[in-house]
């Protein structure tokens, strides 16, 4: 367990805020698989202030998800402050997180996301204003720098703490790296030595063993798991159990994966129209199929589906095939 200000996080495993992924349906599933803290996908400050319908729907929080962190992004201090005030007063979020790590050009070109990393003074100013304006804890997720010549992680981390941030999460890659190359865990260790607030490590945590290694090597307070949890909430469960007991639980069976995939879809359909939910679920279902023999053919079929019944039928036939024990010729998949 650790605390972000007065918010108790029951374990040291955090679900990362992934854009286009971390809606209520995915977050609740992650919570049920053991994540101590789940983070909502980033929302635009200006979209909140303009009362954009899609954005306002993204602010929905199921009480079962809590504790939950809701992330906002923006490049202008005044609009960030006003959006944070709205989140503070009108949502069930426990924590307000500031995005300073998104490397996508459409975000950075408006001086938001990781663009803030280039100005440590602005980092201090915006966080101080947010902290002064809301009652909920304010946290920050940042990358270690823009490129190898512009790494201001120590200044930015110190300024975040000095401005009143209650915790900091660090993805230890530069913006230029995007998701390539190896994450530099030494950065997390160095920041942790300097700060008193909780430091959450992020980057290349792809197994329970690596989660423990990050905790041991960097002394960070928690690990943040992102892409490794896509279609694989068992990664969260197995990591929590491994950190608690030192034992690795079994990988899920194909049937278990498909059952949870369909549960995920049903939850999406509770917050979105069926066709929209099914189309969104196509990418998630592809992740659930990863590692299952014959899953490549299913992935292609998924892109033709429009209803829950169609997806359930496809998966049912696939499971019947898998569980029949039929051996197919190499490179030939029969469903």
Please describe what each predicted stretch is.
Residues 1-335:
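Flavin-dependent oxidoreductase catalytic cores
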């Amino acid at each position: 367990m650790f605390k972000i200000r007065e918010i108790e996080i029951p374990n040291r495993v955090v679900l990362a805020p992934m854009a286009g992924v971390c809606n209520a349906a995915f977050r609740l599933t992650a919570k049920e698989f053991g994540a101590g803290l789940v983070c909502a996908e980033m929302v635009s400050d200006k979209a909140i202030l303009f009362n954009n319908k899609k954005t306002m729907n993204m602010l929905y929080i199921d009480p079962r998800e809590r504790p939950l962190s809701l992330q906002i992004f923006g490049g202008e201090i005044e609009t960030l402050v006003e959006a944070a005030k709205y989140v503070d007063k009108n949502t069930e979020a426990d924590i307000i997180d500031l995005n300073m790590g998104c490397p996508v050009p459409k975000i950075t070109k408006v001086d938001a996301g990781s663009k803030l990393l280039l100005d440590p003074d602005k980092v201090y100013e915006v966080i101080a204003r947010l902290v002064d304006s809301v009652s909920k804890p304010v946290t920050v997720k940042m990358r270690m720098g823009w490129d190898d010549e512009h790494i201001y992680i120590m200044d930015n981390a110190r300024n975040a703490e000095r401005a009143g941030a209650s915790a900091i999460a660090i993805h230890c890659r530069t913006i230029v790296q995007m998701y390539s190359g190896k994450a530099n865990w030494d950065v997390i260790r160095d920041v942790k030595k300097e700060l008193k607030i909780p430091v959450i490590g992020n980057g290349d945590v792809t197994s329970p063993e690596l989660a423990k290694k990050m905790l041991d090597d960097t002394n960070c307070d928690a690990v943040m798991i992102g892409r490794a949890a896509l279609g694989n909430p068992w990664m969260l469960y197995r990591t929590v159990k491994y950190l608690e007991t030192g034992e690795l639980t079994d990988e899920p069976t194909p049937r278990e994966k498909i059952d949870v995939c369909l549960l995920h879809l049903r939850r999406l359909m509770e917050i979105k129209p069926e066709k929209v939910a099914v189309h969104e679920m196509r990418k998630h279902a592809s992740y659930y199929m990863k590692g299952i023999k014959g899953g490549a053919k299913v992935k292609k079929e998924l892109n033709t589906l429009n209803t829950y019944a169609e997806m359930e039928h496809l998966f049912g036939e696939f499971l019947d095939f898998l569980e029949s024990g039929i051996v197919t010729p190499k490179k030939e998949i029969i469903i």
